[in-house]
From Swiss-Prot:
Enzyme Commission number(s) of this protein: 3.6.5.3
The protein's name in its UniProt record: Translation initiation factor 2 subunit gamma
Domain tr-type G: 6-203
HAMAP family in the cross-refs: eIF_2_gamma
Region of interest called G5, as start-end residue ranges on this chain: 181-183
UniProt keyword annotation of Aminoacyl-tRNA synthetase present: no
Originating species: Methanococcus maripaludis (strain C6 / ATCC BAA-1332)
GO MF term (any one): translation elongation factor activity
GO terms for biological process, alphabetical: formation of translation preinitiation complex
Record gene name: eif2g
Protein origin, superkingdom: Archaea
Pfam families per UniProt: eIF2_C (PF09173), GTP_EFTU (PF00009)
UniProt xrefs under SUPFAM superfamilies: EF-Tu/eEF-1alpha/eIF2-gamma C-terminal domain (SSF50465), P-loop containing nucleoside triphosphate hydrolases (SSF52540), Translation proteins (SSF50447)
Renumbered residue ranges of the record's region G1: 15-22
Length: 410
């Protein structure tokens, strides 16, 4: 277990809309991640939601009953030891919010694909989310067959067989399938045991220069606050390498758009780290793993309403260049997933508009040149990314962006 209050691993909660991702996250963490007013109204996740939990184990009970997230053993009421703290990234399942799911996938060390037993499998975004995990290199996957309380045993077995058939030949072919009722809390102990066994904590190298993927940014000041009480802007995200500490200077790229005459360019933002936190707990140093809040000296106007989400942050002078165009080696899927007609994917074409996700950023670009092994794309919004980074590629088909593959930055 990590010595600090930090989580050790980020696990994505993905799957089709309304299959129970947010309910399962709440059952494991006690946190309802849909807190945005529009989310509460519509009953779906719109932004990425985050919540932490500690996996604990009873010293005396047998497996899997010995696993819990509570302060005492659910089976015997006895003492429990904390094994690991984990962060869940709850991604939206609605097809119009695929870009948000893709930007969240870059934070994931593993994923739980939630599939409702009460609907035929696969549903469109079940397919699309699994392809996205594959495209972005998320390998450690568990499948939760949720809502088993709503179906007969025969229907649950039929749905299980559909899941096995659907995952054949994918990154999740050998993933354990765990029947669960998030609503009733049934089989959560089995799920916790599987998380411990199948989603390992990645090996982290804290000696590398720090890099933080920014997934959210906020103005934490309440309207009408006195000037003397105002706090600087807050950014939230995941450190992917190295460590940051309170007092460090921080560079955020791409930064601010500056227009001079008829030319525009982007200027990195430099600020200082005032505080680091996980939930309500303060840290002096933050390392990879979990989702971190970083308090800064920035004008809160720069951070409000996720204005800096998609940025990359690190020590000044250590970040990669900001790219206004990128050259990638594309790897396209055979067919479009997530739509009714699974069309064959055509090669990239010159002058076509694509949506690209790299790290936590989403941008749109136009292909300047396109060959089978190399494509050059001019970006509408620049990104800060390294050579070798993976980029998810989506194409507009009908009125929706559809994932068509990924590329490696050359």
């Amino acid at each position: 277990m990590a010595a600090s209050n930090q989580s050790e691993v980020n696990i994505g909660m993905v799957g089709h809309v309304d299959h129970g991702k947010t309910s399962l996250t709440r059952k494991l963490t006690g946190v309802w991640t849909d807190t945005h007013s529009e989310e509460l109204k519509r009953g779906i996740s719109i932004r990425l939601g985050y919540a932490d939990c500690e996996i604990k184990k009873c010293e005396t009970c047998d497996e899997p009953e010995c696993y819990t997230v509570d302060k005492k053993c659910d089976a015997c009421g006895g003492k429990v030891d904390t094994l690991r703290k984990i962060s869940f990234v709850d991604a939206p399942g609605h097809e119009t919010l695929m870009a948000t799911m893709l930007s969240g996938a870059s934070l994931m060390d593993g994923a739980i694909l939630v599939i409702a037993a009460s609907e035929e499998c696969p549903q469109p975004q079940t397919k699309e989310h699994l392809m996205a995990l594959d495209a972005l290199g998320v390998e450690h996957i568990l499948i939760v067959q949720n809502k088993i309380d709503l179906v007969t045993e025969e229907a649950a077995i039929e749905n299980y067989n559909q899941i096995k058939e659907f995952t054949k030949g994918t990154v999740a072919e050998n993933a354990p399938i765990i029947p669960v009722s998030a609503h009733h809390g049934a089989n959560l102990d089995v799920l916790l045991k599987a998380i411990q066994e199948f989603i390992p904590t990645p090996k982290r190298d804290e000696t590398l220069t720090p890099k933080l993927y920014v997934a959210r940014s906020f103005d934490v000041n309440k309207p009408g606050s006195e000037i003397k009480d105002l706090k600087g802007g807050v950014i939230g995200g995941s450190i992917i390498q190295g460590a940051l500490k309170v007092g460090d200077d921080l560079e955020i790229r791409p930064g601010i758009k500056v227009t001079e005459g008829n030319k525009t360019h982007w200027v990195p933002i430099i600020t200082k780290i005032i505080s680091l936190g996980v939930g309500n707990k303060k840290l002096k140093t933050a390392s990879p793993g979990g989702l971190i809040g970083v308090g800064t000296e920035l004008d809160p106007n720069l951070t409000k309403s996720d204005a800096l989400s998609g940025s990359l942050a690190g020590l000044p002078g250590t970040l990669p260049e900001t790219l206004e165009k990128m050259v990638i080696k594309p790897q396209l899927l055979e067919r479009v997933v997530g739509s009714q007609d699974e069309l064959i994917i055509e090669p990239l074409k010159t002058n076509e508009v694509l949506m690209l996700n790299v790290g936590t950023s989403t941008t749109v670009g136009v292909t300047v040149s396109a060959r089978a092994d190399k494509a050059e794309i001019k970006l509408k919004l620049p990104v800060c990314a390294d050579k070798g980074d993976r980029v998810a590629i989506s194409r507009k088909i009908g009125s929706r962006w559809r994932l068509i593959g990924y590329g490696i930055i050359l």
